[in-house]
């Protein structure tokens, strides 16, 4: 496993007949070497491992989206049958819950009703809660999304939903990285061999580098490094799911927005009699987990379902993550500047800086801001705006705040946002 083009940058795995998995463990390999040669020294371990790596073939990890390893075998999504484990399949992890073809919803806990309460009776959100479980248990396939459970209330159920997922998949199969940790040198290695990553209590701190997180979402390779070891490449399609009261902003705005799946958790159970059995008992109950796994495995969908609430949450996030867009929607359009045929770019620059100051933001306008602003304004209003050089008359300046008169030279051509 690792870089499929280089043994030097790949890890050495061995097949465990008891679990049906290929395992990567320096300690276990050393124990196997000692069983053959009890006099082996520390230096011997490394030499033997290097010899084995040289001799054994380099094989790709199982990447068939239709084969999902569960506790008691490999579930085939096409045939809906459970197949036995085999050393022919290069599998490094499996779901901790067994597949039960006769699984039924337990009479003592209505999972569907609970999901509905989490979603505030929004059927579209309920569907997405099930689809995210399907995505989380299949590390051989990615729908190229990063999940975010967001809710301002501290008692909205998102933590309990995550607990259900962790119990379903198994703690040892879940890494717990937060978004910012994917850019830290030695942290990303934690995702090796994991089925899913679930990070909770994330903050709204700015994410300067999201390249690793984006690569995992799309199934591309990332370079990882463990302390004292050489860097190597891995390919993982582990679903990354995060939760928090707010969302982090990111540099790569367009690509980042395209990958985000924001699920609003707007329920508030603070004023109700909380059923403590849900968190303490039901989400770890064997029958509940087998029913949830059965339902999730039998879902069929290519892309995540559409949801009005999700689209609205994404639109709101996009506005707050993109301060230029926020200025257009919160200040420029409400002041009806978009209705004017000509708006001096120097005015927009000054006005947007004022807006940033009022919002407590420290932002610098990028090179090429004028063209970018015209494009954003066109998309938002559905009209056409261009950045052009031309003159603006004194009487046209009366439509702007008084301070603008001293800033704009009406005698020479200047840059304008022109409505066509």
Listing of model-derived features with the role each one plays in the protein:
Residues 1-10, 35-420:
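Feature primarily recognizes SF3-like P-loop helicase cores of small DNA viruses
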Residues 11-40:
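Short, small/acidic-rich helices and loops at N termini and domain boundaries
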């Amino acid at each position: 496993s690792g870089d499929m083009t280089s043994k030097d940058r790949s890890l050495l795995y061995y097949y465990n007949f008891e679990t049906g998995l290929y395992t990567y463990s320096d300690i276990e390999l050393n124990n196997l070497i000692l069983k053959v040669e009890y006099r082996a020294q520390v230096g011997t371990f490394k030499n033997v491992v290097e010899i084995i790596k040289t001799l054994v073939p380099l094989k790709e990890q199982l990447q068939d989206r239709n084969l999902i390893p569960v506790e008691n075998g490999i579930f085939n999504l096409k045939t809906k049958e459970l197949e036995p484990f085999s050393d022919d399949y290069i599998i490094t992890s499996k779901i901790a819950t067994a597949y039960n073809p006769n699984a039924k919803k337990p009479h003592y806990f209505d999972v569907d009703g609970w999901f509905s309460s989490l979603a505030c009776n929004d059927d579209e959100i309920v569907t997405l809660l099930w689809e995210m479980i399907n995505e989380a248990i299949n590390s051989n396939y990615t729908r190229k999304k990063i999940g975010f459970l967001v809710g301002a209330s501290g008692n909205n159920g998102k933590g309990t939903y995550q607990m259900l997922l962790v119990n379903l998949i198994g703690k040892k199969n879940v890494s717990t990285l937060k978004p910012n940790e994917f850019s830290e040198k030695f942290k990303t290695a934690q995702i090796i061999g994991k089925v899913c990553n679930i990070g909770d209590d994330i903050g709204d701190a700015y994410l300067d580098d999201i390249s690793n997180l984006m690569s995992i979402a799309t199934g591309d390779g990332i370079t990882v490094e463990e302390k004292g070891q050489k860097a190597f490449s891995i390919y993982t399609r582990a679903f990354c799911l995060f939760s928090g009261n707010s969302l982090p902003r990111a540099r790569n705005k367009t690509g980042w927005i395209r990958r985000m799946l924001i699920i609003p958790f707007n329920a508030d159970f603070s004023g109700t009699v909380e059923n403590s059995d849900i968190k303490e008992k039901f989400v770890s109950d064997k029958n509940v987990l087998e029913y949830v796994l059965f339902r999730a495995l039998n879902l069929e969908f290519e892309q995540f379902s559409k949801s009005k609430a999700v689209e609205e949450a994404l639109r709101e996030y996009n506005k707050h993550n993109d301060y230029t867009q926020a200025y257009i929607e919160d200040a420029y359009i409400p002041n009806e500047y978009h209705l004017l045929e000509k708006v001096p770019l120097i005015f927009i620059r000054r006005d947007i800086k004022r807006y940033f100051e009022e919002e407590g933001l420290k932002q610098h306008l990028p090179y090429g801001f004028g063209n970018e602003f015209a494009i954003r304004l066109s998309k938002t209003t559905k009209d056409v705006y261009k950045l052009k050089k031309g003159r603006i008359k004194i009487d046209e300046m009366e439509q702007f705040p008084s301070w603008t008169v001293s800033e704009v030279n009406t005698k020479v051509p200047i840059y304008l946002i022109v409505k066509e």
